[in-house]
Amino acid sequence: MTDSIQPQADTLPHRGAEWWVARAIAVLAALLFVQHGVVHFMGFACTFGLAGSDAVNDGYTLVAALDPDGWTMHALGVAWLLPSPLYLVASAGLVLRRNWWQAWALAATVVSLALCILWLQPAAVGIAVDITILVGLAVYVVLAHRSASCTARSSRRRTR
């Protein structure tokens, strides 16, 4: 009776080590996207004075000359929220193995990088994370293109 509860070895999906490594990297990248998107709420909180620190004017920033209570600073504060949902959508697409996740990740990262550059010193870690994401996206695109062209060549050889 207990044998029926245990899965049979031949019924389990057989996946190679490459598949598991690729899935682990995808999950880790998705977690990075989610974490970086959540951190963007700090930028929003700081610009509206909700964070308990004056990170808007701490260190070297390109927006230090702006009025902290002015409409420009508040518009930039709202802009800090934009990458959050973009990163969440990108992470969902990545985990679900959809083809569109790269575009969402790229859009989120470009907006994030622009905001982090405006707050250069307080957001230095964000710049490093954004550059890491951009490099990762570039590597992914190159590897995916090579894989697709290898697959196409191999299928052409089989049809000859």
Task: Identify the residue ranges that each predicted region occupies.
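Membrane-interface extramembranous regions
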Residues: 2-160
